């Protein structure tokens, strides 16, 4: 049995997000995945939460992480499914199956990019979706999730 993590949120990053900082910096900026994870841990801690940060380029592994979040009774999910946002009904279904409050994040404004990026399956399984704020979107997502959970910043 998985160890409970009731004071934890899952921060899930999908394909190619391990390349942040080097992949098309004119679109995605110079911050790395390690920078994103540090920002998420810091923001989560300000609400008395822990951030369990995961990244995978494989759809099935992302689904396994979502299922694990349910088994461990995590409080919420922040997801940037990358390109899978636009293609993965399986990720959509996994998010709906676990019924954990979820916020979708995208570093870029997906609605200002190629038309195939305008639709997001994962957004339909989330209570909120943020895009275009760069990595600051992760901070905003955690703040929004905390508000949804009724949590206030710790002094």
UniProtKB/Swiss-Prot annotation:
In which residues is substrate bound? 80, 86, 93, 107-108, 117
Tell me which Pfam families the record gives.
DHquinase_II
Q: InterPro entries attached here?
A: DHquinase_II, DHquinase_II_CS, DHquinase_II_sf
SUPFAM superfamilies assigned to the protein according to its UniProt record, in alphabetical order: Type II 3-dehydroquinate dehydratase
| UniProt GO MF annotations | 3-dehydroquinate dehydratase activity
Q: Which UniProt keywords apply?
A: Amino-acid biosynthesis, Aromatic amino acid biosynthesis, Lyase
Which pathway, metabolic or otherwise, does it act in?
A: Metabolic intermediate biosynthesis; chorismate biosynthesis; chorismate from D-erythrose 4-phosphate and phosphoenolpyruvate: step 3/7
Catalysis performed (reactions): 3-dehydroquinate = 3-dehydroshikimate + H2O
GO biological process: any one?
Answer: quinate catabolic process
EC number, as in UniProt: 4.2.1.10
Residues at the active site: 28, 106
Bilayer-spanning residue ranges: none
Residues under site feature: Transition state stabilizer: 23
Role this protein plays = Catalyzes a trans-dehydration via an enolate intermediate.
- Subunit (UniProt): Homododecamer.
Query: Which family is this sequence assigned to?
Result: Belongs to the type-II 3-dehydroquinase family.
Q: What is this protein called?
A: 3-dehydroquinate dehydratase 1
């Amino acid at each position: 049995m998985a160890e409970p993590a009731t004071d934890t949120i899952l921060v899930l990053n999908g394909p190619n997000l391990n390349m942040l900082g080097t992949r098309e910096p004119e679109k995605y900026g110079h911050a790395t995945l390690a920078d994103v994870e540090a920002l998420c841990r810091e923001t989560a801690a300000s609400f008395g939460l822990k951030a369990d940060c995961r990244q995978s380029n494989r759809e099935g592994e992302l689904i396994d992480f979502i299922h694990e979040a349910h088994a461990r009774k995590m409080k919420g999910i922040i997801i940037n499914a990358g390109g899978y946002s636009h293609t993965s009904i399986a990720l959509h279904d996994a998010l709906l199956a676990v019924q954990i409050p979820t916020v979708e994040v995208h570093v870029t404004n997906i609605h200002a990019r190629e038309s195939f990026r305008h639709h997001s399956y994962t957004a339909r399984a989330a209570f909120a979706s943020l895009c275009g704020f760069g990595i600051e979107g992760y901070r905003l997502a955690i703040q929004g999730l905390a508000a949804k959970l009724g949590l206030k910043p710790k002094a």
